[in-house]
Design a protein with these regions (language model features):
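N-terminal glycine-/charge-rich "phosphate-binding" loop or analogous flexible N-terminal tail
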Residues: 1-47, 307
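Hydrophobic Val/Ile/Leu positions in short beta-strands of Rossmann-like dinucleotide-binding domains
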Residues: 7, 147-149
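Short beta->alpha connector loops at strand-helix junctions that form conserved
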Residues: 32-33, 74-75, 91-102, 174, ...
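Rossmann-like adenosine-cofactor binding region
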Residues: 56-62, 175-271
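Rossmann-like dinucleotide-binding domain for NAD(H)/NADP(H)
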Residues: 89, 94, 218, 227-321
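Phosphate-binding beta-alpha-beta segment of Rossmann-like dinucleotide-binding domains, i.e.
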Residues: 89, 97-146, 158-161
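Glycine-rich Rossmann-fold phosphate-binding loop(s) that bind the pyrophosphate
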Residues: 152-153
Length: 321
């Protein structure tokens, strides 16, 4: 009997790349559009493997799927999956950590430049028949300013390399990275408070975990410079949005460029949408045609490898082995 791999949910125009990879091991791919635990349990009950985008893969779900061996996640983060429960149940969890490094680092740099130059304000004015650069004052020279990176993994390292071209001095916070690693990139590794106090621009790249949720909050905003720019291309819940709104509204910080929000799509009554010192894009940082194809192929390859008895390249919960 053929193994069954369910795509729990997806927003892509085609799943042909996934199907091609799973065909190689004779697995049947079954696409669904699950939104809840109950949906996944009902629709995917005989799954050998899952490929997941946003559907919740909880302990309850995994315990209800007796044949489940592997869950592959579209993307870098695995916050939709209870990884600890998966490990206890002997289920391998996979991600694709390297498919969009160029795209996300470019988005972070783009938001940084757009916020620094206040392009949204200027563009909006021109669209409303205005023509006055002075509405964006003051803008200070970017060269020589300090960029603070929260996290120093693959993507922020690429951000650091690109930011050097603009003459930025770069510092970073990452409790898992030794100072000598930072020095290889001409980046100084510092404690969180020091980074937030010194940086003119703060770019968030840490993964979302129980420990990092609301990493940026009322207290940490109080450590920042009043003109500080915050960029987030990682995960929305890393920032306390209510605290962010008040910090921006009260001019305790200067600007925010967000590609992610706590609720996605963003709710129409989100107060951040009322501020002109916020730029928000719809979780697009990961996207290019090439990155999308790479993501789809790699997640399916990983699931196929596990189901055919091979070692997966991008195994998240290594303790499961």
């Amino acid at each position: 009997m053929s193994m069954k791999v369910y795509v729990t949910d997806y927003e892509y125009a085609t799943l042909e790349p996934e199907k091609r990879e799973l065909d190689k091991i004779g697995a049947v791919m079954i696409p669904k559009q699950c939104k809840t635990e109950a949906d996944v349990i009902r629709e995917c009950k005989d799954a050998n493997g899952l490929i997941d985008q946003y559907a919740p893969i909880t302990r309850k779900v995994m315990e209800a799927l007796p044949d489940l061996k592997v869950v592959g996640r579209y993307g870098v983060g695995v916050n939709t999956i209870d990884v600890d429960a998966a490990t206890e149940l002997g289920i391998q969890v996979l991600n694709v950590p390297d498919y969009c490094m160029d795209e996300v680092s470019n988005q972070a740099i783009s938001l940084m430049l757009a916020c620094h130059r206040k392009l949204n304000i200027l563009n909006s004015q021109v669209h409303h028949q205005g023509w006055d650069y002075k509405i964006a004052k003051p803008i200070h020279r970017l060269q020589g300013q300090i960029l603070g990176l929260l996290g120093f993994g693959r993507i922020p390292k690429m951000v650091a390399q690109k930011a050097k071209a603009f003459g930025l001095n770069i510092i970073a916070y990452d409790p898992y990275v030794k100072p000598e690693v930072g020095l290889q990139y001409d980046v100084t590794i510092l404690p969180l408070k020091d980074v937030l106090q010194k940086a003119d621009i703060i770019s968030v790249h840490v993964p979302l975990t129980k420990d990092t949720e609301n990493l940026l909050n009322e207290q940490t905003f109080s450590w920042m410079k009043p003109e500080a720019i915050i960029i987030n291309t990682s995960r929305g819940p890393l920032i306390d949005e209510n605290a962010l709104y008040h910090a921006l509204k009260d001019k305790k910080i200067g600007y925010a460029g967000l590609d992610v929000t706590v609720q996605e799509p963003i709710q129409e009554d989100n107060p951040l949408l009322t501020l002109d010192n916020v730029m928000i894009t719809p979780h697009v940082a990961w996207y290019s045609e090439e990155a999308e194809l790479e993501l789809k192929m790699k997640v399916a390859q990983g699931v196929a490898d596990v189901l055919s008895g091979k070692k997966a390249k991008y195994l998240v919960n290594r303790d499961v082995l």
